[in-house]
């Protein structure tokens, strides 16, 4: 998997307006794994793209009225079938972490990359998702080596607010896949 100017080659691009520049001299050193499903527990629709591009219709589902005002994004989404959608270039600051702290350092958006998995805290993620997440992570480590020792869940950087990627995410499996040499 290759990166060109912050974008994954071959990923579907859906540029989000919800990002800005990282602080001067800041590069990504942390990977944050999230999950998302819109409406909650449903997969495959257009709603994640709509949320991250600020175009979600608050009347399309009762839950959307609660989130339509949010200005959020992630760098990437990995759908259940393994499709990768990229919203923000990796060298820019996506708005995925919110109020957060990692190893005593606040404002995780400044120094992290956020990847969403289409899913829920309690439903097993798919083989395709693990394979793609590992491939993306290896590509990121090639560009940002510190990520290799700094991979965590949203629940770990915002434990009072967030639970994702939840107990369904198999961290050991993910780490084994990341550690495998690329072919």
Swiss-Prot record:
Names of required cofactors: Zn(2+)
Residues noted as binding Zn(2+) in the record, renumbered to the chain: 34, 154, 164
GO CC terms of this entry: cytoplasm
Predominant localisation class: cytoplasm
A Pfam cross-reference name: Amidase_2
Compartment(s) of residence: Cytoplasm
Top-rank EC class of the record's enzyme: hydrolase
Reactions catalysed according to its record: Hydrolyzes the link between N-acetylmuramoyl residues and L-amino acid residues in certain cell-wall glycopeptides
Positions of the record's site feature: Transition state stabilizer: 162
Induction and repression of expression: Inactivation of AmpD results in AmpR-dependent hyperinduction and AmpD affects beta-lactam susceptibility in the absence of cloned C.freundii amp genes suggesting a linkage between AmpD and peptidoglycan synthesis.
Keywords: Cell wall biogenesis/degradation, Cytoplasm, Hydrolase, Metal-binding, Zinc
Active site feature: 116 (proton acceptor)
Enzyme Commission number(s) of this protein: 3.5.1.28
Superkingdom as given in the UniProt entry: Bacteria
GO biological processes: cell wall organization; peptidoglycan catabolic process; peptidoglycan turnover
GO molecular function, one term: N-acetyl-anhydromuramoyl-L-alanine amidase activity
Cofactor detail note: Zn(2+) is required for amidase activity.
SMART domains xrefs: Ami_2
Ranges of residues in domain N-acetylmuramoyl-L-alanine amidase: 30-167
Function: Involved in cell wall peptidoglycan recycling. Specifically cleaves the amide bond between the lactyl group of N-acetylmuramic acid and the alpha-amino group of the L-alanine in degradation products containing an anhydro N-acetylmuramyl moiety. Is also involved in beta-lactamase induction.
Family, per entry: Belongs to the N-acetylmuramoyl-L-alanine amidase 2 family.
Protein name (record): 1,6-anhydro-N-acetylmuramyl-L-alanine amidase AmpD
């Amino acid at each position: 998997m290759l990166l060109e100017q912050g974008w994954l080659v071959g990923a579907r691009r859906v540029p989000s307006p919800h990002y800005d520049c990282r602080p001067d001299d800041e590069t990504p050193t942390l990977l944050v794994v999230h999950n998302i499903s819109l409406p909650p527990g449903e997969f495959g629709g257009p709603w994640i793209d709509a949320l991250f591009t600020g175009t979600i219709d608050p009347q399309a589902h009762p839950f959307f009225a609660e989130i339509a005002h949010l200005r959020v994004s992630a760098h990437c989404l990995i759908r259940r079938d393994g499709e990768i959608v990229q919203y923000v270039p990796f060298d820019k600051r996506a708005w995925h972490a919110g109020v957060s702290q990692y190893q005593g350092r606040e404002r995780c958006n400044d120094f992290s990359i956020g990847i969403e998995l289409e899913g829920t805290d309690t439903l097993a993620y798919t083989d395709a998702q693990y394979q793609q997440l590992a491939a993306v992570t290896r590509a990121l480590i090639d560009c940002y080596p510190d990520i290799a020792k700094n991979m965590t869940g949203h629940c770990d950087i915002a434990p009072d607010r967030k639970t994702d990627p939840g107990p369904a995410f198999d961290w050991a499996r993910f780490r084994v896949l990341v550690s495998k040499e690329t072919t």
